[in-house]
Amino acid sequence: MSLDKIMNEAISPWMKGDGPDSDIVLSSRIRLARNFKKYQFSTMQNEEEAKLIQELFKKEFINKTVEPFGEFELLKMNELTPLQRRVLVEKHLISPNLAGTEYGACLLSESEHISVMLNEEDHIRIQCLFSGLQLSEALQSANQIDNWIEKEVEYAFDESLGYITSCPTNVGTGLRASVMIHLPGLVLTKRISRIIQVIQKLGLVVRGIYGEGSEALGNIFQVSNQMTLGKSEEDIIADLKSVIQQIIQQEKMARELIVQNSSIELEDKVYRSYGILANSRLIQSAEAANCLSDLRLGIDLGYIKGISRNILTELMVLTQPGILQQYAGGPLGPEERDYRRATLIRERLRIEKN
């Protein structure tokens, strides 16, 4: 695995999967927060400690293979260009917070299922990504990597509290489980606000596609647990999965309602968006996201034939500003990005139809 390969292959292998409930659930993510016992939290640590953590991971973990994820490579943030950091964020491999750090790093698996962020809010954040609704499978893989790292690292752990983390809401299991879910039916029927209120009352958090502070582009929402103390990992996963399954049922009911009551209007909306995507010469990120959401809904409902449903996930990543500029070989102005975005979408749709 090389940096060039990571940068130039925008679609991570996990994105090409077709997991359970993938007509509505795009991906499942598990993140485990861990800290070294002997160092101050990242928010308080000095440059020397941050570098020592990097060096330990460089010595013990790079070029090592863990099946089925392949070999691991260490990417140091201060050795990457701002554009390269942005690409990693847009591929969901690192957080925007890590991208802005001087001594942050990322231990990345060849399959890109696993990303271990270093010197972010916590010393170590293990992230595991799977397609569809596969929270239990993602947790099992994250625990496998956690055990691998713990052989070389003494974690900050308290017998009564659990894992000690920088943010109090992560104390305990240190587990953050989240699901990326496509909810156009609930948005179109104007039920999404009520659903979000119910989700929040259950102690879960709803965010946009790139996490905290981001908007829900393309009717894609991220639902995650909030508290990690006082519950086992299995209970956290079970509770989140139960809520997600109820949201899936609500989304399916909303789609059925639209088809029953507004079928021709929905079909028109789908084909108008398809026409924009297939023919535009300039298209901005937000418009592309909304049109791709409509196209994906049309594919799921059988209006559009011969196009993979994975096209939403793929093109939502491929058409992000950083990845467009990476493919172009350097910075692009807004209009140049819109032109390249439109061209890429047209070409991708043409390949699908052929």
UniProtKB/Swiss-Prot annotation:
Appears to be allosterically activated by the binding of pArg-containing polypeptides to the pArg-binding pocket localized in the C-terminal domain of McsB. PROSITE patterns: PHOSPHAGEN_KINASE (PS00112), PHOSPHAGEN_KINASE_C (PS51510). The keyword Repeat does not apply. It comes from the Bacteria. It catalyses: L-arginyl-[protein] + ATP = N(omega)-phospho-L-arginyl-[protein] + ADP + H(+). A motif (RDXXRA motif of the pArg binding pocket involved in allosteric regulation) lies at residues 337-342. GO terms for biological process: phosphocreatine biosynthetic process. One of its GO terms (cellular component) is extracellular space. Gene3D superfamilies: Glutamine synthetase/guanido kinase, catalytic domain. Transmembrane segments: none annotated. Residues 24-254 form the Phosphagen kinase C-terminal domain. ATP binds at residues 27-31, 92, 125, 176-180, 207-212. Keywords: Allosteric enzyme, ATP-binding, Kinase, Nucleotide-binding, Transferase. One of its GO terms (molecular function) is creatine kinase activity. Its EC number is 2.7.14.1. HAMAP family: Prot_Arg_kinase. Catalyzes the specific phosphorylation of arginine residues in a large number of proteins. Is part of the bacterial stress response system. Protein arginine phosphorylation has a physiologically important role and is involved in the regulation of many critical cellular processes, such as protein homeostasis, motility, competence, and stringent and stress responses, by regulating gene expression and protein activity. Belongs to the ATP:guanido phosphotransferase family. This is Protein-arginine kinase. It comes from Bacillus cereus (strain ATCC 10987 / NRS 248). The gene is mcsB.
